[in-house]
């Protein structure tokens, strides 16, 4: 008896497994200090770690079908690659200082390619309170010292980001424990090979602009050698690390794009020459009731499949519009895309369409049934309608909040009718109004609306979700009419002219749909406080 290792067969339609990107392992970090060809090498990896989904173009998963095809292995790496007993046996991204990708930067109009010099330069700039950018596994990040208020405020200006909190990369788990409360489940997630951002209750402050007004802090640990190299040269316990793009745009992956967006705003952009084929943001997780709940599923998780308990072959679900992901059905598995974002941004919509095509190609997917949101003006719904017309396929419209309820039923294996409380932002209802605070009697196929929050005006439509004071005025006007008992300081904070304009809009019914949204109720209450 024996076995043979043979070349990968070409194409198969039964593909559902592609590995997500994996944080660098301890063995590879050790190799950077002990192997001559990998001393301080920033792209070290093995069969147990390194880039996967971010570099793959096609299947089967061979180097020639990844962006590593641009780099020919040196004899030493080739020997590891073909040796069955080696940790780098058939590790497709295997590389070293002699043959692999490398970092480079243009600083003061001079190209710098020496990694040690780049490390010293970037560390000095971070120490001096500058904001820099660096290309990582799934895209560019913007980085600064998390203790330096001036640097973090400058980062907010660059990102055009008002109050949304930033994620923080900590030196190690001990420093995380100094700044936040964490339990065993949370630390297990932080230390896992997936390396997500984990939302934790803050214990000590960093710079105020990191997470203004928040009690939680998004924390993660180093997952690339570059991260560890910075902390070896810096005294700070933590760095702000946020996606390297202007707010609402997709994470940047191309050096020329990064330079166009950021040159002149920051002193240094660290590029590397390994192309990113599939952009992936950092994943975000929160532990609720002892269970890990993914808030944003991307790097480290995508494209791992979910297993359904019913056949889903051929279903292509296009997702919603605001925080979009889409999904493909293969057999009894569901393949969900990486986090896409808000499709109203043109660049994000282009990323969405590109990812739709790439997922279908990668997983040899041929749709037979299309599914989209009930809202006809969502760009995802319009894309679904285009597919239906071009491919002559049936299209099923699904009410937004029933989709939420059905997703929970699938996640928890529920197939009997349930009473579902769906508390959400917005979604078009069957009656043409904006739903979001619903009680359904439903199963996975059908639902009956038992009750809902009272309808109130939604002045300005979508604008009310970004200007919460509008909903405060709407609720107060709805219940008190023109004799509104505004909270102390509310008029001064918002402005009398704005309030009067909104009251006239609601009285005349101009751009004022009605909503039962729980999210807008929360907005109203928070704006009154």
Q: Where do the model's predicted regions map?
A:
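Short acidic/glycine-rich loops and adjacent helix/strand connectors
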Residues: 1-529
């Amino acid at each position: 008896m024996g076995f043979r290792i043979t070349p990968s067969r070409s194409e198969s339609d039964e593909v559902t497994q592609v590995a997500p990107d994996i944080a660098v392992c301890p063995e590879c970090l050790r190799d950077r200090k002990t192997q001559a060809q990998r001393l301080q090498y920033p792209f070290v990896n093995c069969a147990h770690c390194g880039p996967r989904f971010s570099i793959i173009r096609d299947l089967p998963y061979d180097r020639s079908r990844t962006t590593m095809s641009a780099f020919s292995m040196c004899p030493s790496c080739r020997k590891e690659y073909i040796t069955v007993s080696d940790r780098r046996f058939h590790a497709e991204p295997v590389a070293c200082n002699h043959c692999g990708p490398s970092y480079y930067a243009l600083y003061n109009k001079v190209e710098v390619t020496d990694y040690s010099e780049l490390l010293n330069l970037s560390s000095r700039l971070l120490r001096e309170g500058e904001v820099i950018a660096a290309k990582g596994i799934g895209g560019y990040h913007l980085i600064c010292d998390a203790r330096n208020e001036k640097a973090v405020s400058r980062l907010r200006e660059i990102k055009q980001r008002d109050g949304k909190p930033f994620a923080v990369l900590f030196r190690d788990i001990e420093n995380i424990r100094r700044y936040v409360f964490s339990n065993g489940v949370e630390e297990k997630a932080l230390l896992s090979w997936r390396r997500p951002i984990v939302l934790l209750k803050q214990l000590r402050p960093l710079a105020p602009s990191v997470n203004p007004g928040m009690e939680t802090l998004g924390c993660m640990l180093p997952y690339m050698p570059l991260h560890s190299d910075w902390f070896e040269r810096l005294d700070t316990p933590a760095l702000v690390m946020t996606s390297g793009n202007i707010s609402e745009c997709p994470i940047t992956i191309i050096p020329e794009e990064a330079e166009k967006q950021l040159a002149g705003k920051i002193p240094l952009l660290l590029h590397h020459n390994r192309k990113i084929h599939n952009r992936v943001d950092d994943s975000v997780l929160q532990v609720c009731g002892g269970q890990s709940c993914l808030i944003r599923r991307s790097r480290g998780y995508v494209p791992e499949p979910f297993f359904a308990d019913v056949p889903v072959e051929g279903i292509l679900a296009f997702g919603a519009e605001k925080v979009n992901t889409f999904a493909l059905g293969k057999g009894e598995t569901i393949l969900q895309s990486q986090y896409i974002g808000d499709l109203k941004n043109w660049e994000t919509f282009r990323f969405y369409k590109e990812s739709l095509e790439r997922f279908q190609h990668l997983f040899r997917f041929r749709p037979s049934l299309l599914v989209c949101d009930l809202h006809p003006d969502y760009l995802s719904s319009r894309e679904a309608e285009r597919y239906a017309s071009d491919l002559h396929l049936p299209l099923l419209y699904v009410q937004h909040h029933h989709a939420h309820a059905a997703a929970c039923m699938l996640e928890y294996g529920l197939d009997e009718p349930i009473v579902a409380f769906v508390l959400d932002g917005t979604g078009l209802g069957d009656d043409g109004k904006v739903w979001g605070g619903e009680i359904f009697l439903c199963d996975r196929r059908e639902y009956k609306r038992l009750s809902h929050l009272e309808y109130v005006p939604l002045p300005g439509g979508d604008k009310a979700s970004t200007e919460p004071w509008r909903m405060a005025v709407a609720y107060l006007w709805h219940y008190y009419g023109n004799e509104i008992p505004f909270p102390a300081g509310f008029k001064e904070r918002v402005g009398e002219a704005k309030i009067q304009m909104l009251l006239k809009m609601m009285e005349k019914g101009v751009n004022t749909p009605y909503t039962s949204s729980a999210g807008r109720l929360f907005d109203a209450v928070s704006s009154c406080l």
